[in-house]
Design a protein with these regions (language model features):
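Cytosolic, long alpha-helical scaffolding segments
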Residues: 1-203
Length: 203
């Protein structure tokens, strides 16, 4: 049953944007698992982030040109921005590897990137069923659960760093990498919360 007014272009653009989240996160996970050809592969993440920025801009442009929207104008803006934020931090994590010359990232970083992949996939599934107000909340709940897991992984990884890393410069680099990755999972949770609010307003 469709509870939201029909405007396929908005939903198409949101689907495109959420797909870029998954693509960027998968690229980052691959880099962290096997960090060869760093420069080229980080540029690939950057290219996906640029495509997402263009899609976000297209959503905002359409919003400004539309008299009737499928849900609150503010929520359209918030959803676009929050989805884009996830990829911004995914891209930032990738760039930390080049900036800090991290050639052997700690294993927990790939674990965190894997959680971002899972969150991005859940967000994409939630966006895909948003038009018909389908099982969006189930996907939002899973994103939030994964964020709790990421918090635990990040805390454990940082604690381990202070126990085992003897080089203070490396410690600072790795700690910041963990924090940027964990922030990406926080941003995914923020996006899920926006999705949830849209559904609850439409119920």
């Amino acid at each position: 049953m469709r509870l939201l007014p029909r405007d396929e272009k908005f939903f198409e653009l949101f689907g495109e944007l959420s797909g870029y989240l998954t693509e960027g996160a998968q690229l980052l996970r691959g880099i962290l698992e096997d960090p060869h050809d760093l420069g080229i592969r980080v540029e690939q993440v950057q290219a996906v982030e640029h495509k997402a920025d263009r899609t976000t801009h297209a959503i905002i442009t359409k919003l400004n040109q539309s008299f009737i929207t499928p849900f609150d104008r503010e929520d359209i803006h918030r959803l676009a921005s929050s989805l884009d934020d996830v990829l911004d931090y995914t891209n930032a994590a990738a760039h930390r590897l080049v900036l800090y010359k991290i050639t052997q990232p700690p294993p927990a970083s790939a674990e965190l990137a894997g959680l971002i992949v899972l969150q991005s996939e859940e967000l994409a599934r939630g966006v895909a069923v948003l038009e018909k107000n389908g099982s969006v909340l189930k996907h939002c709940e899973e994103v939030n659960r994964l964020e709790d897991v990421a918090d635990h992984v990040s805390r454990r990884a940082i604690a381990s760093l202070f126990d085992t890393e003897k080089d203070p410069i490396q410690l600072i680099k790795f700690k910041e990498l963990f924090e940027v990755l964990e922030t990406a999972t926080d941003k995914a949770e923020d996006a899920a919360n926006v999705l949830e609010a849209i559904v609850l307003k439409s119920a």
